[in-house]
Swiss-Prot record:
Keywords: Amino-acid biosynthesis, Aromatic amino acid biosynthesis, Lyase, Tryptophan biosynthesis. This is Tryptophan synthase alpha chain. The active site is at 50 (proton acceptor), 61 (proton acceptor). The gene is trpA. SUPFAM superfamilies: Ribulose-phoshate binding barrel (SSF51366). It catalyses: (1S,2R)-1-C-(indol-3-yl)glycerol 3-phosphate + L-serine = D-glyceraldehyde 3-phosphate + L-tryptophan + H2O.
Length: 280
């Protein structure tokens, strides 16, 4: 199923631009609203969607995504329900890649073979599991690759030349460069250093390199897009959703549009930084 991811990057290259990768939490603030948000993302300009798996101990997530996960859990969202949302999304969209992002515990509890079967059937294209290092590839990474699911690794500012080959060894789909140290949504990246880091990674792999953590505005997205194959935005979208909620964390009449509006701004930023189209 990496074909959808490959096709998305190919389309962006043909247009001479980076891809916009958007993250939202599954089930936030409730499953039905979450599905509407998911459906709105590609229509607003997202090229790839990361769908977060709610978890009780999200160690790499900042306050915004932690709060989103708690709202989703309170609404009864679990891994089975998340796969069901993706199945429903696929009824109307068979083109946009969907990558599940989260932690290993819910997958382990579900059962790896069962999870991979159900993820493939639901139309999942890839996985980002932030707490499974390369040393544990046999747990999930290698079985996922055998099923045709991309297993996407994170590289960070502290990933040195000695560590990078291990990070890239079984990576598929794309490489996700975390532009800051710390948790999500807590700082703005140093754009100059990000470009240097992307160049360092691309010297070791032919995979697209996307950059996330700290991207909040269309201007930020444009800066990153000039030096990367893709721009990931998560906390800013989750924040936009949270600000739209009614008391009691209920979806408001403008909740879906609050997210879609920011995605349109981000998409415009990415497109404003367009490079020469591939082959031009």
């Amino acid at each position: 199923m990496t074909a959808r991811i490959d096709a998305a990057f190919a389309r962006c290259r043909a247009e001479g631009r980076a891809a916009l990768v958007t993250y939202v939490m599954a089930g936030d603030p409730d499953p039905e609203t979450s599905l509407k948000v998911l459906e709105a993302l590609p229509k607003a300009g997202a090229d790839i969607v990361e769908f977060g798996l709610p978890f009780t101990d999200p160690m790499a997530d900042g306050p915004a995504i932690q709060a989103a996960g708690l709202r989703a859990l309170k609404a009864g969202q679990d891994l089975r329900g998340t796969l069901a949302l993706v199945r429903r999304f696929r009824e109307g969209d068979d083109q946009t890649p969907v990558v599940l992002m989260g932690y290993y515990n819910p997958i382990h509890t579900y059962g790896v073979p069962h999870f991979l079967e159900d993820a493939q059937a639901a139309g999942i294209d890839g996985l980002i599991v932030v707490d499974l290092p390369p040393e544990e590839d046999e747990e999930l990474c290698l079985p996922a690759l055998e099923k045709g699911l991309a297993f996407i690794r994170l590289a960070t500012p502290t990933t040195d030349e000695a560590r990078l080959p291990a990070v890239l060894a079984n990576t598929a789909g794309f490489v996700y460069y975390v532009s800051i140290t710390g948790v999500t949504g807590t700082a703005t990246p140093d754009f100059g250093r990000v470009s240097q880091a992307v160049s360092r990674i691309t010297a070791h792999t032919n995979l697209p390199v996307v950059v996330g953590f700290g991207v909040k505005t269309g201007a930020h997205a444009a800066e990153i897009a000039r030096g990367a194959d893709g721009v990931v935005v998560g906390s800013a979208l989750v924040d936009a959703l949270a600000r739209s909620l009614e008391p009691g964390d209920r979806a408001g009449s403008g909740t879906v549009e609050a997210v879609a509006s920011l995605v349109r701004e981000l998409a415009q930023g990415v497109r404003s930084a367009a490079k020469a189209p591939a082959g031009a």
